[in-house]
């Protein structure tokens, strides 16, 4: 049976299918982990330790050396995305109630959900899109996008926007596995190759554990809102990313659209933030559901929109070239 190939036909399938299976488990048998105990309970409830190992391996996979073009492109996209998420957080914190919207169509929406959905780019999706529609340097710009993975950037945004406060040691704790992995991976290429293989392997495991924190009734309640959140992520982050790519990154805007997605790792952010700041715990389940839906929506729409944009840009460039030749 070609199970893996079937799962990968779904956008973000290796993340979303185990997530859904975990949610099924939690919805219909919430006490399964405690009942079975031991290793089974560890797989069901081990979101944080599994993610800690994943962050370590992610750090180890990043190469310190990169060309100036790659760093400029990557830095432009990462900084722009984070800056937009910060602005959204600052505005949302003045409009949305402290504990999120609790009634009506927007029930479940919180500043935590907005920031988690907007501050991370799906690096793998970006790289695959730009390999088709961009240059090698543009495709390689995903190198710094890995720095967005994990709760650190979300913590910085929430902290600097005055929405939450984190002790310095909490910041260190959040980024330490990543930094240790990064150091080891760059000190020894063989270690980088060894640990980087686990990045993709661990995704289904932390996704399943994460799914076991989600009640499917919450997803049913936030489904349409999650779709709208996904569209909002593309519009709100995509426009500034296109502008930044043109003005600073030296591109034609294609990379900007390709970077306007939500990363699969963002689904874990609400739960991780809630572990550090208990005040966010009531919002975490709904925020996780919203972000998961946004990940699906952006994974489907971003490649389509990038393709349309790229064709129009190339057609315009060809037309200008023809006119220039005629003159």
Swiss-Prot record:
Catalytic activity: 2-dehydro-3-deoxy-D-gluconate(in) + H(+)(in) = 2-dehydro-3-deoxy-D-gluconate(out) + H(+)(out)
Location of this chain's protein in the cell: Cell inner membrane
MF annotations from Gene Ontology: 2-keto-3-deoxygluconate:proton symporter activity
Keywords on record: Cell inner membrane, Cell membrane, Membrane, Sugar transport, Symport, Transmembrane, Transmembrane helix, Transport
InterPro entries: 2keto-3dGluconate_permease, 2keto-3dGluconate_permease_sub
Alphabetized Pfam families for the sequence: KdgT
Family: Belongs to the KdgT transporter family.
Name of the protein: 2-keto-3-deoxygluconate permease
Gene behind this protein: kdgT
């Amino acid at each position: 049976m070609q199970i893996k190939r079937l799962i990968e036909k779904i956008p973000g399938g290796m993340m979303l299918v185990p997530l859904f299976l975990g949610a099924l488990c939690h919805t219909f048998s919430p006490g399964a982990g405690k009942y079975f105990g031991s290793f089974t309970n560890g797989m069901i409830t081990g979101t944080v330790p599994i993610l800690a190992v994943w962050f370590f391996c992610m750090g180890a996979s990043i190469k310190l050396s990169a060309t100036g073009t790659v760093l400029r492109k990557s830095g432009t996209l990462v900084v722009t995305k984070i800056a937009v998420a910060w602005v959204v957080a600052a505005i949302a914190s003045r409009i949305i109630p402290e504990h999120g919207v609790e009634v009506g169509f927007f029930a479940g929406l919180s500043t935590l959900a907005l920031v988690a959905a907007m501050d991370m780019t799906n690096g793998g999706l970006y790289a695959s899109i730009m390999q088709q529609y961009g240059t090698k340097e543009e495709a390689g710009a995903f190198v710094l996008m890995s720095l967005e993975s994990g709760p650190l950037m979300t913590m910085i945004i929430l902290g600097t926007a005055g929405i939450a406060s984190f002790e310095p040691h909490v910041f260190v704790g959040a980024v330490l596995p990543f930094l240790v992995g990064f150091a080891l991976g760059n000190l020894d290429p063989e270690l980088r190759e060894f640990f980087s293989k686990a990045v993709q392997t661990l995704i289904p495991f932390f996704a399943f554990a994460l799914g076991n924190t989600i009640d499917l009734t919450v997803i049913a309640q936030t489904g349409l809102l999650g779709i709208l959140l996904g569209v909002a992520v593309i519009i709100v982050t995509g426009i500034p990313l296109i502008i930044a790519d043109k003005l600073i990154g030296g591109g034609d805007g294609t990379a900007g659209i390709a970077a306007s997605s939500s990363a699969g790792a963002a689904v874990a952010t609400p739960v991780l933030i809630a572990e550090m700041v208990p005040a966010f715990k009531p919002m975490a389940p709904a925020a996780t559901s919203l972000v998961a839906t946004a990940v699906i929506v952006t994974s489907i729409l971003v490649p389509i929109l990038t393709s349309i944009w790229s064709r129009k840009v190339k057609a315009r460039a060809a037309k200008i070239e023809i006119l220039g030749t005629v003159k």
